[in-house]
Amino acid sequence: MSQLKNDRYLRALLREPVDYTPVWMMRQAGRYLPEYKATRAQAGDFMSLCRNAELACEVTLQPLRRYDLDAAILFSDILTVPDAMGLGLSFGAGEGPKFARPVENAAMVENLPIPDPETELQYVMNAVRTIRRELQGEVPLIGFSGSPWTLATYMVEGGSSKAFTKIKKMMYADPQTLHKLLDKVSDAVILYLNAQIKAGAQAVMIFDTWGGVLAHRDYPDFSLQYMQKIVAGLIRENDGRKVPITLFTKGGGLWLEQIANSGCDAVGVDWTVNLAEAKAKIGHKVALQGNMDPSVLYARPARIRQEVRSILADFGNGSGHVFNLGHGIHQDVPVENPKIFVDAVHEYSKAYHK
């Protein structure tokens, strides 16, 4: 593999010195880019795009051609794992994901297979290998998965949800079945992420998009303990380098100390979290990633720069901060605005790394 030319992202995750704060954006390969829309049209539909290694590589690299980003993230979807477990994933035009065979009871959990990442999910590993080759060591490649709780919400609800009544019914009325499901999904995710690391992912991130819908006493049992199980099962060194792990629970500000004790290297935070307070609580133990509200990217350039300055000031001096949005970039953001954002992070952060 090519020697890494820009390893600031990996160094910041390990709280090692950097000369400026590295930055990337969740969903940086996506619908706000006209070239992404063109490639997706060429693929035919979303899952065909994910399953074509060359096209998945192309959309992964597109934002790096426009913006001076410090990391690439694999173009894929968190639902590849439950899809490979036989739930029948589909994306209707303009609709969210749907599963033809949602998980409804203990017998269905029992019958779920744990997919082999190099057979049922080989298309993801092929994409990782292709992207690593094409990146030529410019920036690190991030692999990822959904968290067991977040994946289980889709598997039980049969798709996206606003109220999460089906999975919460299972959680309160039949917790044993839900724990069995979460345990099985954790095993599948460990295999999946380790396969991504072996294929060339240099860091991994676990997206716990729906952890924040849990009651404060349920989160450790139904979300965090399973992410902790994954962290304990992951390959932590590859190619002679540490493979850093970031956990991101949207709405997870209540549980920062517990997340930081999970064994991860970095904790992602959304825009509801005060970065200065988060650093004071857990910055001695883990790096922090975040946390600009993605809607700031609708603003005028001066307002974007002002927000970048404020967040950098919140974190203050030293390494251990990866600048990012607090969630994915919105699909109708003006395409020139991420450049203003990324360049501002690089320019204004240098003063904090002397």
Swiss-Prot record:
Keywords, in A-Z order: Cytoplasm, Decarboxylase, Lyase, Porphyrin biosynthesis
SUPFAM superfamilies given in the database record: UROD/MetE-like (SSF51726)
Any one Pfam family match given in the protein's UniProt record, by short name: URO-D
GO molecular function list: uroporphyrinogen decarboxylase activity
Location (main, coarse): cytoplasm
Enzymatic reactions: uroporphyrinogen III + 4 H(+) = coproporphyrinogen III + 4 CO2
Signal peptide bounds: none
Pathway: Porphyrin-containing compound metabolism; protoporphyrin-IX biosynthesis; coproporphyrinogen-III from 5-aminolevulinate: step 4/4
Enzyme Commission (EC) number: 4.1.1.37
Lyase recorded as keyword: yes
An example Gene Ontology CC term for this record: cytosol
Site (Transition state stabilizer): 77
Location of the protein in the cell: Cytoplasm
Amino acids binding substrate: 27-31, 77, 154, 209, 327
Class of this enzyme: lyase
GO biological process: protoporphyrinogen IX biosynthetic process from glutamate
PROSITE patterns documented for this protein: UROD_1, UROD_2
Oligomer and partners: Homodimer.
NCBIfam families: hemE
Function (record text): Catalyzes the decarboxylation of four acetate groups of uroporphyrinogen-III to yield coproporphyrinogen-III.
Family the entry assigns: Belongs to the uroporphyrinogen decarboxylase family.
Designated name of the protein: Uroporphyrinogen decarboxylase
Native organism: Actinobacillus succinogenes (strain ATCC 55618 / DSM 22257 / CCUG 43843 / 130Z)
